[in-house]
Amino acid sequence: MRIFLSAIYWNHSKFLWNSENWPIKVPWYGLCFSLGILFASLLGIYLAKSSYNSEDEKNFSKEQLSGALENFALYSLLFIIPGSRIAYILFYGGDFYFKHPREILKVWNGGLASHGGMLGLILWALIFSWRYRKKISVLTFLFLCDLCASVFGCAAFMIRIGNFMNQEIVGKPTSLPWGIIFSSPAQGVLGVPVHPVQLYEGMSYLLLSIILFFLSYKRYFRLGSGWVTSLGLVGISLIRFFAEFFKSHQGKVIGPNSPLTMGQILSFPLFVFGLCLGIACFLKNKKKRSPTSSVK
């Protein structure tokens, strides 16, 4: 890495380990992705255990809760990765994967979409809560979604760091002093300083997640189920929407002159769903607080 007067030249290797004597390569993106999921899982389990109370002790132990959430985190990858891949193929791949179907399974060549990963995680939370709720009553669908919303920023931040190391999802040209000149960018123009939009987006997700984590920590039942998910979806969609303005070409929906990117279009349903969920939670809490008249 070399720092110029007006930009930072980034020529760091995309691999943590890449030896000619060994066939195994360790890319930074894969490491960041794995560590992000691991850290988010550990934080989620810790957060769930912080809400464990005397009422829960009557039905299940803290160890049972921890074990169930470990299974949830482990098997979530079977939904996150395929969901991310399918969404990328449908919304960003164009005709390439239809002409080259063998490339669909080559995830190691890149091509994951975060919106698809979120949908995969939501589907897994729905299935998991259906299977486990009778054993551990606290593991409702909204409880799991609130947990994921509270810790997602850790994974999202690490994944965007991986994108940065991989020199992909490159920003638009900038004259700002922290502009980055990537040595081999996946998009954009070579040798031009660009916004480090991966860092903008990743740090924004992390900040949002920190706020949601502290809103949830030992206060889950007071806040009410669904609120954290609602705030998370609204926040994620807004961050993604505005981050797209700093990115180079990434899947224009109609043509090169389209005002919106595919990422912005896909963020709109998340925003609407999060807003509707927030309204539903507000009305539900308002109904609980309203005084009931008794007949005498």
Curated annotation (Swiss-Prot):
Biological process, per Gene Ontology: lipoprotein biosynthetic process
Topology in membrane: Multi-pass membrane protein
Chain ranges passing through the membrane: 28-48, 72-92, 110-130, 139-159, 197-217, 226-246, 263-283
Binding site for a 1,2-diacyl-sn-glycero-3-phospho-(1'-sn-glycerol): 160
Gene Ontology CC entries for this record: plasma membrane
MF-aspect GO terms: phosphatidylglycerol-prolipoprotein diacylglyceryl transferase activity
Function: Catalyzes the transfer of the diacylglyceryl group from phosphatidylglycerol to the sulfhydryl group of the N-terminal cysteine of a prolipoprotein, the first step in the formation of mature lipoproteins.
Protein name: Phosphatidylglycerol--prolipoprotein diacylglyceryl transferase
Organism: Chlamydia caviae (strain ATCC VR-813 / DSM 19441 / 03DC25 / GPIC) (Chlamydophila caviae)
The organism's taxonomic lineage, starting at the top: Bacteria, Pseudomonadati, Chlamydiota, Chlamydiia, Chlamydiales
